[in-house]
Amino acid sequence: MDVKELRNQSVSALNEMLIKLLKEHFEFRMQHKSSQLDNFSKLGKTKKSIAQIKTIIRQKQA
């Protein structure tokens, strides 16, 4: 999702997306440790998305 689209979301919707991404990132890490993850870039992409959402949530709360 684009950053502009994320900024238009409500804080509750962003929190739901954040929880989903955190679970997804956890699954990717477990797959990576057990050598089942094919595409390692998924780890970096989810980590970046998590950081973007956290930043937007903090900006909206300030």
Curated annotation (Swiss-Prot):
- Keyword Ribonucleoprotein assigned to the entry: answer is yes
- Ribonucleoprotein among keywords: yes
Instruction: List S-S links within the chain.
Output: none
Any single GO CC term annotated in Swiss-Prot or TrEMBL for this entry: ribosome
Tell me the InterPro entries matching this sequence.
Ribosomal_uL29, Ribosomal_uL29_sf
Q: Name one GO biological process term.
A: translation
Q: Tell me the keywords, alphabetical order.
A: Ribonucleoprotein, Ribosomal protein
Q: Name one GO molecular function term.
A: structural constituent of ribosome
Enumerate the HAMAP family for this protein: Ribosomal_uL29
**NCBIfam families given in the database record:** L29
The record's family statement is: Belongs to the universal ribosomal protein uL29 family.
Q: What is this protein called?
A: Large ribosomal subunit protein uL29
- Organism listed in the record: Vesicomyosocius okutanii subsp. Calyptogena okutanii (strain HA)
Q: Tell me the organism's taxonomic lineage.
A: Bacteria, Pseudomonadati, Pseudomonadota, Gammaproteobacteria, Candidatus Pseudothioglobaceae
